[in-house]
Amino acid sequence: MTMTDPLGDMLTRIRNGAARRKSSVSTPASSLRARVLDVLQSEGYIRGYSKVDFENGKAEFTIELKYYEGASVIREIGRVSKPGRRVYVSVKSIPQVANGLGITILSTPKGVMADHQAREQNVGGEVLCSVF
């Protein structure tokens, strides 16, 4: 079965796992997912992730969710740019999430990064998702 939005699927798995208080969730591996997970880990929204390779050539990420005092660190996570409606922004119009308390993850010519990094590097791009 083909998946039309692999990144959206990963975000949904994270959201559902956090709602059910799971310690970890699994998702098929891809390079875009790895770069988004790197940003989530560096910003402190997940504890980490590991890649598991299978004999059939496929791979899977196991994402360790992060909790603080019993509540998930991720309150909201959602896709902004979707396969049917891409959202591109310039550096001046990068959205802030919850007045800067959350992050927006962008895919830029300089790589996948958080909104504050894109502002520092003066680069815009596609708004992949927002996290709060």
UniProtKB/Swiss-Prot annotation:
User: Where does the signal sequence lie?
Assistant: none
Please give the GO cellular component terms listed in this UniProt entry: ribonucleoprotein complex; ribosome
One biological process GO term for this chain? translation
The record, for SUPFAM superfamilies, names:
Ribosomal protein S8
Which top-rank group of organisms is this from? Bacteria
Q: Which GO terms describe its molecular function?
A: rRNA binding; structural constituent of ribosome
What's the short name of a Pfam family annotated to this entry?
Ribosomal_S8
Keywords, comma-separated and alphabetical: Ribonucleoprotein, Ribosomal protein, RNA-binding, rRNA-binding
Oligomeric and partner information? Part of the 30S ribosomal subunit. Contacts proteins S5 and S12.
**Entry's PANTHER family?**
40S RIBOSOMAL PROTEIN S15A (PTHR11758)
Q: Record's family? A: Belongs to the universal ribosomal protein uS8 family.
Do you know which NCBIfam families this protein is assigned to? PRK00136.1
User: What is the role of the protein in this entry?
Assistant: One of the primary rRNA binding proteins, it binds directly to 16S rRNA central domain where it helps coordinate assembly of the platform of the 30S subunit.
What is the name listed in the Swiss-Prot or TrEMBL entry for this protein? Small ribosomal subunit protein uS8
Native organism: Agrobacterium fabrum (strain C58 / ATCC 33970)
